[in-house]
Structure formats: structure tokens, C-alpha cells
């Protein structure tokens, strides 16, 4: 007769009791001919609008739209990747327009979303944290 090791039994029970956290899923769509990517949580939401083909003219028309439950009118949002990379985005009325954001910061934000993993959007009074799968085909620059 084979007796299960107590250490193995405890390890198996511990592994079964550890909850598996599902990744936050981007909702992908198209609005006015532009690709959109949205994430929502109980604490707020974020929507990225891309214009890789310059549909509405030669200037960039991308935007990051944010809504925080505890900070209704932030003037700055920082996108923080788990790696420590950060992008600072000036916000007006919940919108960070690509044309108004430093190109390097916009690129860092897009790279963070493209890479997936854990990241946060932070204001002076609130934050949203997500963990997503990579978006390797994200074209938003």
C-alpha cells in the first residue's frame, strides 16, 4: 500500500487553494474608423483610441480617455509599468490627446500596453491597476 507523504498532501492542497487570477481583457472595437481598446475595473476605466493611418489628417489623433472614481478631474496621469518604465500624460477633461503628449511618453505608454503584464495608471489622488495579455499588434503611434 502506498502512503501519500504529508508534505506532498499539504503542497497539493495549497496549490489547489491558491486562486488563479484572470487577466484583465482589453475590449477591442472601432469608433469612427479608429481602433479602440478599453479596460474597466470597479475603480474606473481607460480607453485608448488609435489613429495609426492618420485617418483624419496628418497630425496624430490618438487619445487616452481615463475615468477614476476618486479623482474626477486629474490634470496628469502617469502610466507605470511593473518594470519601472513610466509615461507622463497631461490630461484635460479626462482626455490625454496624442498631439499634446510628448512623443517619447506616448511611445512608452503604447509599449507598456503592447507588452502586457501588470501596469498602473496613477494620478495624485487615485490609481487603476491592470494585468493584461500582450497586444503585439497594437499600432498606436
Label each residue range with its predicted role.
Residues 1-8:
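Bacterial N-terminal signal peptides that target proteins for export
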Residues 9, 17-19:
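N-terminal signal peptide c-region/cleavage motif recognized by signal peptidases
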Residues 22-72:
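An ectodomain-focused feature that recognizes extracytoplasmic/extracellular
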Residues 73-78, 117:
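Short beta-strand/loop motifs in extracellular/secreted proteins, especially
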Residues 81-141:
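Internal interaction segment
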Amino acid at each position: 500500500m502506498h502512503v501519500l507523504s504529508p508534505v506532498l498532501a499539504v503542497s497539493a492542497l495549497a496549490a489547489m487553494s491558491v486562486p488563479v487570477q484572470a487577466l484583465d481583457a482589453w475590449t477591442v472595437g472601432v469608433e469612427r474608423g479608429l481602433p479602440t481598446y478599453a479596460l474597466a475595473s470597479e475603480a474606473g476605466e481607460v480607453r485608448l483610441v488609435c489613429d495609426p493611418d492618420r485617418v483624419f489628417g496628418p497630425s496624430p489623433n490618438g487619445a487616452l480617455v481615463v475615468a477614476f472614481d476618486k479623482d474626477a478631474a486629474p490634470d496628469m496621469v502617469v502610466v507605470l509599468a511593473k518594470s519601472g518604465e513610466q509615461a507622463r500624460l497631461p490630461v484635460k477633461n479626462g482626455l490625454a490627446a496624442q498631439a499634446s503628449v510628448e512623443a517619447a511618453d506616448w511611445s512608452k505608454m503604447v509599449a507598456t500596453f503592447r507588452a502586457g503584464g501588470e501596469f498602473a495608471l496613477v494620478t495624485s489622488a487615485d490609481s487603476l491597476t491592470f494585468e493584461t495579455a500582450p497586444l503585439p499588434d497594437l499600432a498606436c503611434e
